[in-house]
Design a protein with these regions (language model features):
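Amphipathic terminal alpha-helices
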Residues: 2-9, 20, 316-324, 328-350
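N-terminal Rossmann NAD(P)H-binding glycine-rich loop of SDR-like oxidoreductase domains
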Residues: 21-40
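NAD(P)H-binding glycine-rich loop region in Rossmannoid oxidoreductase-like domains
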Residues: 55-57, 61, 65-106, 114, ...
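Conserved Rossmann-fold NAD(P)-dependent oxidoreductase catalytic core, especially the SDR/UDP-sugar
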Residues: 110-154
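Catalytic helix-loop patch of NAD(P)-dependent Rossmann-fold dehydrogenases
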Residues: 137-184, 205
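Substrate-positioning beta->alpha
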Residues: 161-162, 189-195, 210-232, 242-246
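Conserved C-terminal active-site "lid" loop/helix of NAD(P)H-dependent oxidoreductases
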Residues: 220, 244, 260, 283-292, ...
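Mid/C-terminal beta-alpha module of Rossmann-like enzyme folds, strongest
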Residues: 233-300, 338-341
Length: 350
């Protein structure tokens, strides 16, 4: 987390402090923040990932290097633990479908199999609201919403399959839960905000649609908080077992108003150019076809999924998380932006 855990919060995760915990994908944005929070709690935490993480090793955090698609490597990392946070995933909206399925679907199967064989009783899965995004506006939607029947990107398709199987595996011997944080941002972010800023600075970002769409966003500390609460629940009452939870800030934001306000703080030109959704969606369709036919690896500047995400509203009810997990955002949106701007100022080369 970007700020130390307070004593009052530590009491919210008292059962976790005595656990031996594995975090897959512990070198990523959410994963690393989760690892550091668990370390602050006093838990015995280890990491599994593709690379070595010298910064974590310097903190005496064991790092198991391996491929999530290697079932034996996953089993070795899981062995000896009694709680697993499965955060590792191939993110993004473009790339070979086979890679997304191998890493996100089969990789999750490997984690599930390892937890079963090693008798790990708790598995918390990092999912995404993209599993229910089915082209339409989502305003205050809750977890009763069905999975998307026609996902527009391999990432969403692979996460649907993984979440379905992990939740279906819930049983008295292995309690599972899925956390769906939306658009996670904050200090340490190497993807969402940096990409927005890069596109804004280059003039390649346009407002898609009429600019009125609202979205959920999630400050990093709040995403971590939700994961910790979920694990704590499974270790105690287990009322959350077998369920998924949407996670976000105290309320949704107008996407383009929020982006432009952030850009103003960062001295990035505001987004003023507008593109109709139909035009952006058509461009995405064409670019996807061209990139596929030419076997281009780089992400198209526009895709169908991206066009819809930029134009449609997608925000969710957090009532289930509030009722069963006791979730409330620790950091409000305005304070989160202040912390993000300060972090960017401290880490961006002059």
């Amino acid at each position: 987390m970007s700020t130390p855990l307070t004593s009052s919060l530590t009491s919210s995760y008292s059962a976790l402090a005595s656990q031996k915990i594995l975090v897959t994908g512990g070198g990523g944005f959410i994963g690393k923040a989760l690892v550091l929070a668990l370390r602050d709690l006093g838990a015995e935490v280890r990491v599994f990932g593709r690379s070595r993480y010298p910064d974590l090793e310097a903190l005496s955090i064991p790092c198991f290097q391996g491929d999530i698609c290697d079932q034996e490597a996953v089993r070795r990392a899981v062995a000896g633990t009694n709680c697993v946070f499965h955060v590792a995933a191939k993110a993004g909206i473009w790339g070979p479908r086979s890679e997304y399925m191998a890493i996100n679907h089969q990789g999750s199967r490997n984690v599930l199999a390892a937890c079963t064989s090693e008798q790990v009783p708790i598995l918390v899965y990092t999912s995404t609201p993209s599993v229910v995004f089915n082209r339409d506006n989502l305003c205050g939607a809750d977890e009763s919403l069905p999975y998307a029947s026609r996902p527009l990107c391999a990432y969403a398709a692979s996460k649907i399959l993984a979440e379905q199987e992990l939740l279906a595996a819930n049983c008295p011997d292995l309690k599972t839960v899925a956390i769906r944080p939306h658009l996670v941002w904050g200090p340490g972010d190497t993807n969402l905000i940096p990409r927005l800023v890069e596109r804004g600075q280059s003039g390649h970002l346009a407002m898609v649609g009429n600019g009125s769409n609202k979205v959920d966003i999630t400050y990093i500390d709040n995403a971590v908080h939700a994961h910790l609460l979920a694990a704590e629940n499974l270790l105690t009452s287990a009322s959350a077992a077998g369920q998924a939870f949407f996670i976000g800030q105290e309320k949704p934001v107008n996407l383009w108003t929020w982006i432009n306000a952030l850009f103003t703080r960062l001295a990035v030109p505001e987004v003023q150019r507008r593109v109709p959704l139909a035009m952006a969606y058509g461009a995405g369709t064409l670019l996807e076809l061209v990139h596929t036919l030419r076997r281009r690896q780089e992400e198209p500047r526009m895709t169908r999924f991206l066009a819809l995400q930029l134009a449609k509203s997608h925000w969710f009810s957090h009532a289930r998380a509030e009722q069963l997990l006791g979730y409330r955002p620790l950091v409000d949106t305005a304070s989160g932006v202040d912390r993000l701007v300060a972090w960017l100022a401290a880490t961006t080369p002059c």
